[in-house]
């Protein structure tokens, strides 16, 4: 499209927003209206210090968000009654699939030998959850059996079960006896739980659940037409080596001070690749952070008040509806009522009155209505609901009494255990204190608000403020994903336009926005390929060719999709070895399903043989999957369709400027050629079809889409091309600066790099004993986040400057690395100790530099202020180098009173 100015776009997006109608939604089914506390919205959600940071792999410059995510894990562990929680997954439905996959991978030897492959799912889980389970289980050879948990008989082939609490209709069920039966048969049980209900209800961990998962959306996160929001996942300690997703753990730094870090990373795809327990990479860190702050702000008593008010309102509403002649079918419930209409009441008439009152209700078959109350429901809302139901019954009603505080479910379901008694959940209950706590944590982190983040293959570009502003509009925030079509015309137009733009950019014919991350996009693309092959009688094809340089998510996604991976060598110039590629494609031509190729490659170069590789795959009966992680070097210059690919995924949080959020949210849409369009993901609720459903919501994290839409509309065709050229130019500028010092590991046929470059650090280690990790830690003393460490080549640093950085910032980065180079030279030449030097001891926290005692051979000034400009702008790390081995040997994944 033609580019818009910021002012023109502001007017345009206002017009689109006005086409969305914000009704009061009682649909429920996993999404509920909430109150996002203003200090959290203002100081986290709308604060670039929080939304522009990267996943906290570099712990020393991530202590703030690591602490915030540890708070989240503590909330989840204590509310679920289980000792171990991760720091978020993509959504509730994919968390269900992750639980099933974990159970399958954790089968006993006897179960593996007996080929136990049946998963039981109760019939009263959310429809979207069941759809995603089916999508994810079938390729792994797992049989999904749906039935009534009360009557299901466990047999030796059943390895796991999934139930909902309260169930999809809102009923609180007693699963204790079911779990006893499951355990007796060797099956493990996962419970999909409503997090807010666990404030009042007995935690599933206390009655034997092996996993408890769900959505934390109710903790202050808007509905956003389906997302983003953070899923949670808690389990027993015995699964700590197989739990999916990232875990924050408490460790210590070089001086014994408490420090936080990502724990047990050897489970994850970037290390284990095809043997990983999950393909998940980007999750929902920003939303988990917000949910954690919500719990910090309200504390245990505040949460009890909120949950109690929701439940009391539901109970009061039940009594008043029964006076009007309606019947409530749920004997025990938390917030959701299932109402049977009397014969003389028309469901259509009731819906018509509801819509006139701007109210959305859930409609079941057989004349039943669902009402899910939430945090925002007040006496006026209850009065409107009773007016609707009275009108449909031909009666008058006026609310005359206040809602009494009362419990309406059987006392046996009531929670008796305390939760959130740690200091952090007691200290910050005023806006002033919370604001200062959030600010203190933010100061401990490096984000794009501080300096360039040059992580290779991560594309840490600017998230323009003008693209972020629409997210705070209620017309985008407060829409339920199952709202009627005529209430979401603005979203519909935006989604259709954005899909068309992405198709044009990629050269493809179809697009889905449903995947919630790049890894989810990979899985979706492979699932679409599998469905297509099955449709043409080629379902036996199960081999995926992968270059040795592939992102770890590629092999992990392929295995999750039921494929077998075959690795192709790379030559000494960093290219995929064409002859090895050809030989392995030919050797597997009868079973070749696909090849996954990143372009430019993860080695930072444009593969000159890319088209020939596409032709080879097609000649052998396979499909070409292009990993879009590096699309920032393609947009406007070429595209996957032109090159010859059949499908690609995009990372909106990389190429298209939506924020990384410290580890999510992400969006990983896929675009496909015409022959694959019929196999794109559907949705059971909105479209009545569960083909290849990969996310809980029909459009995934729809709330993020206005960012990318704004980015494309304001840049226009020429602007997008200029972005790509500038990104490549910046990378080559840095390559020219570093080629005579560190050296560049790979360059392309023209002697240039793509949009990223790999710095050679292996020879540095040979000469001085200084390794790439030491360089990464020393960069922190200058206020910089490290480049990508030891990927895709061990012993190197991969740098991607993006188009967003000015020449002045690039030159500052060069100056810093040249300073570090000179420090390395001092070690090589014997001018500095090989053991006690600024690199081996980096980073240097303020408490160390300002201590009375200084034990190092070099001066404090060299440690903290090696360059003059640091006196004007100094970022202080909060901890010294973190002890990773200690943290993994002593996993502490929640706040506790233990001594370190």
Where are these regions (language model features)?
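Non-catalytic terminal extensions of PLP-dependent enzymes
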Residues: 2-23, 35-51, 57-60, 69, ...
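N-terminal export/assembly segments and adjacent metallocofactor-ligating motifs
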Residues: 55-65, 71-74, 86-90
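Conserved PLP-enzyme active-site core in the AAT-like
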Residues: 64, 94-259, 321, 334, ...
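A conserved hydrophobic secondary-structure block that centers on an alpha-helix together
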Residues: 75-96, 115, 119
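Short helix-loop-beta connector
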Residues: 82-83, 507-509, 538-540
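General small-molecule cofactor/ligand-binding pocket signal
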Residues: 85, 143-147, 329, 362, ...
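Conserved phosphate/anionic-ligand binding catalytic regions in large, soluble enzymes, centered on
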Residues: 221-234, 238-239, 283-287, 372, ...
């Amino acid at each position: 499209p033609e580019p818009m100015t910021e002012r023109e776009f502001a007017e345009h997006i206002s017009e689109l927003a006005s086409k969305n109608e914000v009704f009061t939604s009682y649909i429920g089914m996993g999404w509920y209206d909430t109150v996002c506390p203003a200090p959290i919205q203002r100081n986290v959600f709308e604060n670039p210090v929080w939304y522009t940071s990267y996943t906290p792999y570099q712990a020393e410059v991530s202590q703030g968000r690591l602490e915030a995510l540890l708070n989240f894990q503590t909330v989840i562990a204590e509310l679920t009654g289980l000792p171990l929680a991760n720091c978020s997954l993509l959504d509730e439905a994919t968390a269900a699939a992750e639980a099933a996959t974990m159970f399958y991978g954790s089968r006993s030897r006897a179960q593996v030998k007996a080929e136990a492959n049946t998963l039981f799912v109760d019939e009263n889980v959310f429809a979207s959850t069941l759809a995603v389970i089916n999508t994810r289980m079938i390729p792994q050879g797992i049989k999904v059996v749906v039935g009534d948990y009360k009557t299901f008989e466990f047999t030796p082939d059943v390895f796991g079960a999934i139930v909902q609490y309260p169930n999809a209709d809102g009923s609180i069920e007693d699963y204790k006896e079911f779990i006893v039966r499951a355990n007796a048969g060797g099956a493990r049980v996962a419970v999909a739980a409503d997090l807010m209900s666990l404030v009042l209800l007995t935690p599933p961990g206390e009655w034997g659940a092996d996993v408890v998962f769900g959505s934390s959306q109710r903790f202050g996160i808007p509905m956003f037409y389906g997302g983003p929001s953070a899923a949670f996942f808690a389990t027993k300690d015995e699964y700590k080596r197989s739990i999916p997703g990232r875990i924050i753990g408490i460790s210590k730094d070089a001086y014994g001070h408490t420090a936080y870090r990502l724990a047990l990373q050897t489970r994850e795809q970037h290390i284990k690749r095809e043997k990983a327990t999950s393909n998940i990479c980007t999750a929902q860190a920003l939303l988990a952070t917000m949910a954690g702050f919500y719990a910090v702000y309200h504390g245990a008593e505040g949460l009890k008040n909120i949950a109690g008010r929701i439940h009391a309102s539901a109970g009061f509403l039940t009594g008043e509806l029964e006076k009007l002649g309606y019947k409530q079918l749920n004997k025990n419930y938390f917030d959701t009522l299932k109402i049977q209409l009397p014969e003389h009441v028309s469901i259509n008439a009731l819906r018509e009155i509801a819509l006139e009152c701007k109210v959305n209700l859930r409609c079941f078959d057989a004349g039943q209505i669902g009402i899910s109350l939430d945090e925002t429901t007040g006496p006026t809302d209850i009065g409107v609901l009773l007016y609707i139901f009275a009108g449909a019954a031909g009666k008058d009603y006026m609310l005359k009494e206040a809602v009494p505080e009362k419990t309406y479910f059987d006392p046996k379901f009531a929670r008796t255990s305390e939760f959130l008694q740690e200091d952090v959940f007691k200290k910050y209950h005023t806006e002033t204190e919370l604001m200062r706590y959030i600010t203190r944590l933010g100061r401990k982190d490096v984000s794009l608000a501080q300096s360039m983040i040059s992580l290779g293959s991560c594309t840490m570009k600017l998230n323009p403020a003008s693209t972020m502003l629409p997210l705070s509009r209620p017309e985008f925030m407060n829409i339920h994903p199952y709202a009627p079509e005529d209430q979401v015309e603005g979203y519909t137009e935006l989604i259709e336009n954005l899909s068309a733009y992405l198709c044009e950019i990629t050269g493809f014919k179809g697009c889905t926005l449903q995947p919630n991350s790049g890894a989810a996009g990979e899985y979706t693309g492979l699932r679409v390929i599998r469905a297509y092959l099955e449709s043409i009688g080629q379902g036996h094809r199960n081999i995926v060719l992968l270059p040795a340089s592939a992102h770890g998510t590629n092999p992990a996604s392929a295995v999750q999709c039921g494929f077998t991976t075959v690795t192709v060598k790379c030559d000494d110039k960093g290219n995929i070895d064409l002859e090895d590629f050809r030989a392995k494609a030919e050797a597997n031509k009868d079973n070749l399903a696909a090849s996954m190729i990143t372009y430019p490659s993860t080695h930072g170069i444009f593969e000159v043989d890319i088209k020939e590789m596409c032709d080879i795959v097609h000649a052998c009966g396979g499909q070409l999957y292009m990993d879009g992680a590096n699309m920032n070097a393609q947009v406007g210059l070429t595209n996957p369709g032109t090159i010859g690919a059949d499908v690609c995924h995009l990372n909106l949080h990389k190429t298209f400027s939506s924020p990384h959020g410290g580890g999510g949210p992400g969006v990983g849409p896929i675009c496909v050629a015409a022959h694959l369009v019929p196999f794109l993901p559907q949705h059971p609720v909105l479209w009545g079809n569960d083909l290849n459903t990969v996310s809980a919501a029909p459009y995934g994290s729809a709330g993020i889409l206005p960012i990318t839409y704004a980015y494309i509309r304001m840049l226009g065709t020429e602007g997008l091309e200029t972005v790509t050229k500038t990104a490549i130019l910046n990378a080559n500028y840095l390559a020219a600066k570093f080629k005579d010092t560190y050296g560049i590991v790979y360059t392309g046929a023209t002697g240039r790099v793509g949009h990223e470059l790999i710095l050679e650090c292996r020879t540095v280690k040979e000469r001085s004993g200084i390794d790439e990790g030491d360089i990464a830690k020393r960069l922190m003393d200058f206020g910089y986040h490290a480049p990508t460490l030891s990927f895709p080549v061990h012993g190197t640093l991969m740098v991607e400057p993006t188009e967003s950085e000015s020449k002045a910032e690039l030159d500052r980065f060069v100056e810093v690395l040249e300073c570090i180079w000179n420090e390395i030279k001092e070690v090589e030449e014997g001018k500095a100790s090989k053991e006690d030097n600024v690199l081996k001891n980096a980073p240097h926290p303020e408490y160390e530099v300002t201590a009375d005692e200084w034990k190092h051979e070099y001066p404090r000034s060299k440690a903290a202020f090696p360059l003059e400009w640091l006196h004007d702008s100094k970022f202080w790390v909060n901890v010294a180098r973190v002890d990773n081995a200690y943290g993994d040997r002593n996993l502490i994944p929640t706040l506790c009173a233990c001594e370190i």
